[in-house]
Amino acid sequence: IDVPKDFSSAAYLIAANILTDKDIPLIGIGVNKTRTAFLDVLKEMGAKIELHNDCIISNEKRADITASLKKNLKGISISGKKIPNLIDEIPLIAIMAMFAEGKTTIRDAKELRYKESDRISLLLDNIKKFNPNIGLTEFEDGFEIIPSKNLNNDSVDLETGGDHRIIMSFVIAALATDKKINFDETESVETSFPGFFEVIKAWYQ
C-alpha cells in the first residue's frame, strides 16, 4: 500500500497508531520543521514519538516516524504562536482530546471557521453526536473539550460539510471505539489522501 509522504496525511496514521496501540512505522515522511508541530503536541499529551533514519530528499528533510502510547493521554492548552503551524491538525487534536484525561483548550484558531467548512462548529457538533457525554464549550476562536466515557456504541450519522479533514479525523476516532460512523459523503477524502480508507482497513481494522 502506497502511503503519502507528506506530513499532513501521515498525521492521521500517527494518531491511529497511538489510539489503537499499534506501532506501525511510517517510512520517509516529510518532517519539515514548519509542519511537524503536531508531533510536539502529541509528546505533550503523553505519546512517545521517535524519528529514525533522517535524510534529505529533494531538499526536504524526511524521517521514519514511530508513535506509541506508554501512558494515558492528557489534556493540554494550545494558543498563540503555536496555532499557525498546527491549523490543519486541530480537528485531529480534538479527536485525541476526546480520549485524554483532563481538559483540552484551543484558542486563537479563528481561521478554522473559514476552511472547507466552519471547522469549529462542525467539529463540535460531530463530537457531540459521537459522544454526548463529552463537555464542550465553543469560542469564536476555538473550543474546550472535557472528556467523558462514551457509554453508547450505537452507530452515528455525521455531517461532513464536504470537509476531508473532518471525515478523516472521525475515522480515527472510530478506530478507538466500537462505534460505526455513517458519513453523508466521503469522496472529498480522495482529494487529499487517495487510498486513505484502504490504508486504514489494511493496517488498523
Language-model segments: what does each one mean?
Residues 1-205:
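Short, structured segments at the rim of ligand-binding sites
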